[in-house]
Amino acid sequence: MFPILKRREPKRAVGWGDELIIRPDTPLNAAQKKQLAKAIKRAKRDGKIAATAQQTIPYEEMYENGVCRLGNRLYSKSIAFEDRSYAEASDDDKAVIFELYCRLVNYFGPTVAFQLSVVCYYPDMAEYRKILRIPPTGDSFDPIRKEFSDMLLTKASLCKTERSLCLTFTVEAEDVKQAASRLEQIQADVLERFKGIGTQAHGMDGYERLLLLHHCLHLDEPQRFKFNWDSLVGTGLSSKDYIAPSSFLFKEGRYFRVGPSVGAVSFLQIQATKLYDTLLNALLNIESSQIVSIHAKALDQGAALKTVKRKLSDLDKAKIDEQKRAVRSGFDMDILPPDLVTFGKEAEKLLEDLQNHDEKMFMVTILLVHTAPTKQKLENIIYSVNGIANANNCNLIRLDYQQEQG
């Protein structure tokens, strides 16, 4: 059989030129550190990196083990996982997968906030050409190697966007050592649950998290990620210097600008009594660079029960007021407004789930970030997304004058 060369890992560079090729974990000598620091300063001076862009990136320090210090005694870690073939599964398999995901979500208590993120970004085709190219060896199998390489590249070019999925969880701790211990335990438990679902997952190290942040900040302009841990020592550089875009502008209330692209942040207002599993899939199938993030935090069980019971008491009071009004008007007191009856049944079911089925109540926010080269194209994308949301009894609400916070 003819030999097929193994897939080559792309070289990860530092600096802004191709003359300094160093892997992320390669120690740098003093001359290389000096060269790198000069490259960063030159990029800042030329406007390739903006100081305000770094201030917008919401973390203080990223560590090699994947722990990120967010500030205010908060620390986070992320798990990358593969997409499960849920849509093609049978109804019975879907029910099992859904139940397992529910158990995963219920694992998180009120002291741990978590965020499910799906990042869709345009691939760097120049990098793919380097990776997929099989160099000739001078034998008779070179035409086959070229044909195979071209086929792989053609298939890669058919993919409009790449998709990365990660689960990020956040805890409060006194210092990074205490945070790392807690986060490692949570990571081990979550990975075990992903294994039960049948989904491949692994804890992300600091480089992987920075790479994903780099994708988030360069959705429309694929750029090679150039980074080295040793370059942060004794140079005054920060990991933000390597992932920051050329600029962030939030002067317009309904838009923001990141580098050459224009973007918008919206949240999903849920009005439906039940959300179907097709909603997220439909949102992600939009051919656009985007970030869909689901932020959730469980309420304390005691507080959740009090909230539901208080709501039931308010509904009972409203029923009594309606019955009194009906009697005074000469109507049948047993005829109540449909909304009161519906809300009462839903509240009773929720209380039953909380008390007897070990369910939890979560505070959930769903944010969507879309970017495009022009405002017109961005508005077309948002119009399509809003149509999907409306079909599921939801509304897409723009975060006016809160784009940076979003």
Regions found by a protein language model. Name each.
Residues 1-48:
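Compact, Lys/Arg-rich rRNA/RNP-binding cores from ribosome-related proteins
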Residues 2, 34, 38-41, 47-406:
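Extended, folded cores of ATP/NTP-driven motor/assembly subunits in large transport
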